[in-house]
């Protein structure tokens, strides 16, 4: 399936992508989706804005197998420099800037995640939950377990930066052995 077949109109709304955004083979975008500068949507991710809008802001990345959807009452807004891990589900929620959403985490309708926070792998952010800025949120159902240190918070955008470099390599056709440097992992 080529890119034109994976970028689908719905109800007279079409996805819009910044010229330097990257959409990997197998990813699908439907309806009122806006993908910002240097943002990326990776293999087998589904971004479906059939009932409301989805905004993926600059330098954010939606990793392999993630699902982004909306509800009648809420769109989904993903801030700048956000990393949405493999298999995560974001449904009708708001994610602040420089947030790391761990692999297989779920964020439900009306939830808001404050900037510079980490949603741990497999965490469940229930509907309407407000996660304060700078929080480490773990568990299912999840809860804030502690505040992130200033050093941990400042390192979160580096994960998104890695994906900006990686998507540029894919766009430029750089050989498979390319590997941008890994950011340091924040302590949990």
For the regions a protein language model found, what residue spans apply to each?
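N-terminal segments that cap or nucleate solenoid repeat domains
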Residues: 2-41
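Glycine-rich hexapeptide-repeat left-handed beta-helix
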Residues: 1-17, 50-58, 64-66, 70, ...
């Amino acid at each position: 399936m080529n890119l034109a077949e994976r970028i689908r109109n719905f109800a007279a709304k079409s996805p819009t992508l910044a010229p330097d955004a990257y959409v990997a083979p197998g990813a699908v975008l439907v309806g009122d989706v806006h993908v910002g500068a240097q943002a990326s949507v990776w293999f087998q991710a589904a971004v479906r804005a059939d009932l409301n809008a989805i905004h993926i802001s600059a330098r954010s990345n939606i990793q392999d197998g993630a699902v982004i959807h909306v509800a009648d009452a809420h769109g989904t807004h993903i801030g700048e420099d956000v990393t949405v891990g493999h298999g995560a589900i974001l449904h009708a929620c708001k994610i602040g800037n420089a947030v790391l959403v761990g692999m297989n985490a779920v964020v439900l309708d009306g939830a808001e995640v404050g900037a510079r926070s980490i949603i741990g792998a497999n965490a469940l952010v229930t509907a309407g939950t407000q996660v304060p800025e700078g929080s480490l949120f773990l568990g299912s159902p999840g809860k804030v377990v502690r505040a992130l240190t200033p050093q941990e918070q400042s390192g979160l955008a580096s994960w998104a930066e890695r994906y900006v470099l990686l998507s540029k390599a894919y766009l430029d056709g750089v050989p498979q052995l390319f590997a941008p440097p890994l950011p340091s992992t924040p302590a949990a």
